[in-house]
UniProtKB/Swiss-Prot annotation:
The gene is rpl2-A. InterPro entries: NA-bd_OB-fold, Rib_uL2_dom2, Ribosomal_uL2, Ribosomal_uL2_bac/org-type, Ribosomal_uL2_C, Ribosomal_uL2_CS, Ribosomal_uL2_dom3, Ribosomal_uL2_RNA-bd_dom. GO terms for biological process: mitochondrial translation. Part of the 50S ribosomal subunit. This is Large ribosomal subunit protein uL2cz/uL2cy. It is found in: Plastid, Chloroplast. SUPFAM superfamilies: Nucleic acid-binding proteins, Translation proteins SH3-like domain. Residues 1-23, 223-274 are annotated as: Disordered. GO terms for cellular component: chloroplast; mitochondrial large ribosomal subunit. Belongs to the universal ribosomal protein uL2 family.
């Protein structure tokens, strides 16, 4: 993705950087609306996730994470913007008339052909089981549970690496640095997710952040004691504690929050680096 820098004509464009525009013209049978989605509220209207609300209305695109059109070649017809994720999506026309969206692999262009199955070429955009891939293959959209669809390495620029195969399991190095075991029968897509330069974008102004449905974040140290454990004091006072905490008094910034004795602990060979 090309990054375009703004000229400093207004304060909001100063040091601004945006990606190249990709239009979106979704198919009606592959989209549907979502009511009360992304506002950070539960069914009772109570805030359960802070700093969310507003934003532009969105239509959800049905993405084919399972890639279960086996041994049927498909052609990339469009590359579109998806407001629900930072990666682009591709519209695929399969030979049997089926039309589906998939994540856009890096380097894929309109007119390329992809296929999924057990004995397919190791080329960008093709989906196949891990047992049929050579070591060192760069992959994304990786299944954890067989047949459930890809759940790992789906963000823009994400890529994992197949580093070993032994017995019924394959060893993967994930984008976070975590090394874990996954069944060799699980499927993955060859290549890296596109839109790699998304982290180089600079929104430039607060309004652009609000369009994304993200509200302002207020520091706890400037609140009152009734609102946050860090609040209170005269002037610019420190937090008054040995370690920072969340608004509800739980340890923050470094405390491990993963549950103990989780079923997947035995599958993680090396934890992600912080």
């Amino acid at each position: 993705m090309a990054i375009h820098l703004y000229k400093t004509s207004t304060p909001s464009t100063r040091n601004g950087a945006v990606g190249s525009q990709v239009k979106s013209n979704p198919r009606n049978n592959l989209i549907y609306g979502q009511r009360h989605c992304g506002k950070g509220r539960n069914a009772r209207g109570i805030i359960t996730v802070r700093h969310r609300g507003g934003g532009h209305k969105r239509l959800y695109r049905k993405i084919d994470f399972r890639r279960n059109e086996k041994d049927i070649s498909g052609k990339i017809v469009t590359i579109e913007y998806d407001p629900n994720r930072n990666a682009y999506i591709c519209l695929i026309h399969y030979g049997d008339g089926e039309k589906r969206y998939i994540l856009h692999p890096r380097g894929a262009i309109i007119g390329d052909t992809i296929v999924s199955g057990t004995e397919v070429p190791i080329s960008m955009g093709n989906a196949l089981p891990l047992t049929d891939m050579p070591l060192g293959t760069a992959i994304h959209n990786i299944e954890i549970t067989l047949g459930k669809g890809g759940q790992l390495a789906r963000a823009a620029g994400a890529v994992a690496k197949l580093i070993a195969k032994e017995g019924k399991s394959a060893t993967l190095k994930l984008p976070s640095g975590e090394v874990r075991l996954i069944s060799k029968n699980c499927s993955a897509t060859v290549g890296q997710v596109g839109n790699v330069g998304v982290n180089q974008k600079s929104l430039g102004r607060a309004g652009s952040k609000r369009w994304l449905g993200k509200r302002p974040v207020v520091r706890g140290v400037v609140m009152n004691p009734v609102d946050h454990p860090h609040g209170g004091g005269e002037g610019r006072a420190p937090i008054g504690r040995k370690k920072p905490t969340t608004p509800w008094g739980y340890p923050a910034l470094g405390r491990r929050s993963r549950k103990r004795n989780k079923y997947s602990d035995s599958l993680i060979l090396r934890r992600r680096s912080k």
